[in-house]
Amino acid sequence: MSAIQGIEGVIIQLQATAMSARAQESLPQPTISFAGQLHAALDRISDTQTAARTQAEKFTLSEPGVALNDVMTDMQKASVSMQMGIQVRNKLVAAYQEVMSMQV
């Protein structure tokens, strides 16, 4: 008799788990595409370079409030972000070449 009650308890737990899984499936999942993320990253790199270039132009024109250390920091940030973008591109190209060389 206790074995039957144990089995019924397990069945109830499984049904509860199945119901919660169905509830989670019905929630809309945000769609984040790889292409969208890549485009956003490229935009951030471009924005960083534009900001650094603007700071350098302001410093060159001797505008008040623009210090050399700010310009150097912005230029270094732009350089690092560009190098990161290049490395990501290199990894993507290497992965693409590896996939293309696989035999089907």
Swiss-Prot record:
MF terms in GO: cytoskeletal motor activity; structural molecule activity
Location(s), subcellular: Bacterial flagellum basal body
Main localisation: other
Pfam families cross-referenced by the UniProt entry: FliE (PF02049)
GO-annotated cellular components: bacterial-type flagellum basal body
A GO BP entry: bacterial-type flagellum-dependent cell motility
Keywords: Bacterial flagellum
InterPro entries attached to this UniProt entry: FliE (IPR001624)
NCBIfam families (alphabetical): fliE
HAMAP family: FliE
PANTHER family listed in its UniProt record: FLAGELLAR HOOK-BASAL BODY COMPLEX PROTEIN FLIE (PTHR34653:SF1), PTHR34653
Similarity-based family: Belongs to the FliE family.
Name of the protein described by the UniProt record: Flagellar hook-basal body complex protein FliE
Gene: fliE
